[in-house]
Regions:
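Short beta-strand-to-loop element that shapes/binds the nucleotide-sugar donor at the catalytic cleft/hinge
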Residues: 111-140
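Acidic donor-binding/catalytic loop of UDP-sugar-dependent glycosyltransferases
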Residues: 88-101
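Glycine-rich, basic loop-to-helix element that forms the pyrophosphate-binding segment
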Residues: 60-76
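Short aromatic/hydrophobic "clamp" motif used to bind/position activated sugar donors
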Residues: 81
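A recurrent flexible, glycine/aromatic-enriched loop bordering the glycosyltransferase active site
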Residues: 143-199
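Catalytic core of nucleotide-sugar-dependent glycosyltransferases
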Residues: 221-223, 227-238, 258-293
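Active-site donor/metal-binding and catalytic loop motifs
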Residues: 118, 188-194, 198-223, 234-266
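Short, well-formed alpha-helical segments that are part of the catalytic scaffolds
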Residues: 13-33
Length: 316
């Protein structure tokens, strides 16, 4: 995909659900800068009547956070793209901050948002005034991978994000102790980060054919696109000559995203990603890092399955 001067700087994609409070939509529309909002609703949902030329409302052919997110991403026209959820609040100045970041770090692929998490129902903290953001990001101290001290991030350093170590060899020990090469400052997930959209669109075209199983039968990763897309992008653009390439930074506080915990009746559960990551393996079988991930998921399958059965028995 090529971009002209007429396209928005940032596309913000949000999968929607029924009953999103009007206050959330009002907060979203307070976001400043050259931005397009792509709100993607489940089938048969009623669209909001909002007069805002920055707003594009779509209806996904399938219900589900990830199916809706995928629909939005395929329609994103901005130079950069960001996804988050419809129960999360974003700092109004994020688009302009992202502009400054990519001007000052033009080789970066990704800017990871700092976030603050709150217990369910803490509306006072969620709606508190936002803090001022730095003008010159290049003047911030940087926590580099070579420093070997990730704690520097907590003291106000920007954290370097190296590319995922795709070159790692397959580790047979994953079968009995699980994988360990996921630990470190690199990122696996796609969500809550500002990405170069040209790379995102190229990666989507890379993985979409992998959704085909047998003939017309398709597999749609209803809850697994996050890590699938994040790692597929890094695998597609991985340069073996630069195994420690820095592809972006995680910004320090103040928080750019506020995340409210789920209500007690909808507590977060561990999700099983294997089927989505088989798509990743089919496309990039040459990387040991992905094999380690797959083996770890296979190893976890009995535990996750037993936990799911136990929850159903308790609920029933």
């Amino acid at each position: 995909m090529s971009f002209s001067a007429l396209v928005p700087f940032l596309s913000i994609v949000v999968p929607m659900r029924e009953g999103v409070p009007a206050q959330w939509l009002e907060a979203l529309r307070r976001v400043q800068g050259d931005v397009e909002f792509i709100l993607v609703y489940p089938p048969s949902a009623q669209l909001e009547k909002i007069a805002d030329e920055r707003l594009l409302q779509l209806v996904s052919p399938f219900r589900g956070e990830i199916a809706q997110r995928l629909t939005g991403l395929l329609n994103a026209s901005g130079r950069y793209v960001l996804t988050f959820n419809c129960d999360e609040l974003i700092h109004p100045e994020v688009p302009e901050l992202a502009r400054r970041y990519f001007e000052q770090f033009p080789d970066s692929w990704v800017m990871r948002l700092s976030k603050e998490e709150f217990p369910y129902g803490n509306t006072a903290a969620l709606n508190a005034p936002w803090e001022a953001l730095p003008e010159n990001l290049a003047a911030l101290p940087i926590c580099r991978q070579a420093d070997g001290n990730l704690a520097l991030y907590e003291s106000g350093h920007m954290l370097e994000i190296p590319i995922a170590p795709m070159h790692n060899r397959f580790d047979w020990k994953c079968w009995w102790r699980g994988r360990r090469d996921h630990q470190g400052p690199h990122a696996e997930n796609f969500d809550k980060k500002v990405w170069v959209n040209e790379k995102v669109q190229a990666t989507l075209q890379e993985i979409l054919p992998g959704l085909g199983l047998v003939g017309p039968v398709k597999y749609l990763p209803f809850w697994c696109l996050d890590r699938l897309l994040g790692l597929a992008l890094q695998a597609k653009f991985y340069d073996a000559a630069r195994p420690k390439q820095v592809i972006g930074h995680k910004l320090p506080r103040p928080a750019l995203l506020r995340v409210e915990d789920n209500p007690p009746e909808f507590r977060r559960r561990a999700r099983f990603y294997l089927f989505a990551e088989i798509i990743l393996l089919r496309r990039f079988p040459q990387y040991g890092y992905i094999w380690n991930l797959i083996v770890h998921q296979i190893r976890e399958f009995p535990v996750r399955a037993m936990s799911a059965v136990k929850r159903r028995l308790v609920a029933g």
